[in-house]
């Protein structure tokens, strides 16, 4: 199974916007359950999308149906290279770079739900088969 690699900031922004759209429409459903739904939707379209443009198009169609725009980070992501090759560890250490910048990175920085909760873990082993 091949999965499209998407910039983490783009993925988080799209999922947060999708969760917000769902929350506006489904106020009686707990936000944590909407988050699980968004994670499932994201995994599905990551699997179905052959490229970044199709991935964004899936979100655009879904968000437009709820009356929400794409987040501004989408345009920024399309203008910049989506991935920059990470130098291997030997190259980093050869250059004297022995520090890893993890400031501000937390498990909850993208999602307002504990990723270790049973409802989220239930989707951890889900796989989608190709047509």
Swiss-Prot record:
GO terms for cellular component: cytosol; mitotic spindle pole body; nucleus. It comes from the Eukaryota. It comes from Schizosaccharomyces pombe (strain 972 / ATCC 24843) (Fission yeast). This is Uncharacterized protein C11D3.16c.
């Amino acid at each position: 199974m091949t999965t499209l690699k998407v910039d983490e900031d783009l993925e988080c922004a799209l999922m947060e916007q999708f969760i917000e759209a769902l929350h506006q429409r489904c106020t009686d459903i707990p936000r944590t359950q909407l988050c699980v739904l968004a994670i499932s939707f994201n995994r599905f379209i990551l699997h179905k999308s052959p490229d970044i443009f199709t991935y964004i198009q899936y979100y655009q169609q879904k968000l437009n149906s709820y009356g929400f725009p794409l987040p501004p980070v989408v345009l920024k992501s399309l203008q910049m290279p989506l991935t920059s090759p990470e130098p291997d560890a030997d190259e980093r250490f050869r250059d004297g770079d022995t520090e890893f910048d993890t400031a501000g990175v937390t498990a909850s920085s993208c999602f307002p739900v504990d990723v270790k909760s049973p409802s989220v873990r239930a989707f951890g082993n889900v796989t989608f088969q190709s047509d």
